[in-house]
From Swiss-Prot:
Its EC number is 4.2.1.59. InterPro entries: FabA_FabZ (IPR013114), FabZ (IPR010084), HotDog_dom_sf (IPR029069). This is 3-hydroxyacyl-[acyl-carrier-protein] dehydratase FabZ. It comes from Synechococcus sp. (strain CC9605). The keyword Isomerase does not apply. Transmembrane segments: none annotated.
Length: 151
């Protein structure tokens, strides 16, 4: 995937809320810094100690749960598939994962940079994206995510 060289905000949290159904505490995309609708997106997730999962995961050594890293990547992927032209109305839901690997811990204070690229769209209902999340340029998580359109 290509490295974004801009720090400009392309989509604000308010604009993201207009595109995705997720709300606090499950809205995991803070801003989008690069977006080619229907093709790719790069977004930021600022990880803070104030997030509810850190009360129990783990109090003495807080780590962002891997499932939430994957969900953050899926939300960025959702920004891509929901912006595809000529798609029927409905809700794209997270439908599967392939080859996901966790490479480093993500802790409060980290900033996840999440990049997703559309790999395929079949029958205007099933999408697949390649996703990766990095912290300070180091790969934290990567894999392929699938989406399905529900009417």
């Amino acid at each position: 995937m290509t490295e974004s060289t801009t720090s400009d905000v392309v989509l604000t949290s308010e604009q993201i809320a207009g595109l995705l159904p997720h709300r606090y505490p499950f809205a995991l995309v803070d801003r989008v810094i690069a977006h080619d609708p229907g093709v790719s997106a790069t977004a930021i997730k600022n990880v803070t100690m104030n997030e509810p999962q850190f009360q129990g995961h783990f109090p003495e050594r807080p780590l962002m749960p891997g499932v939430l890293i994957v969900e953050a990547m899926a939300q960025v992927g959702g920004l891509i598939v929901t912006q595809m032209p000529d798609l029927p109305k409905g809700l794209f839901v997270f439908a599967g994962i392939d080859g996901v690997r966790f490479r480093r811990p993500v802790v409060p204070g980290d900033q996840l940079v999440i990049r997703c690229e559309l790999l395929s769209l079949k029958r205007k209902r099933f999408g697949k994206v390649k996703a990766e999340a990095t912290v300070d340029g180091d790969l934290a998580c990567s894999g392929e995510l699938m989406f399905s359109l529900v009417d």
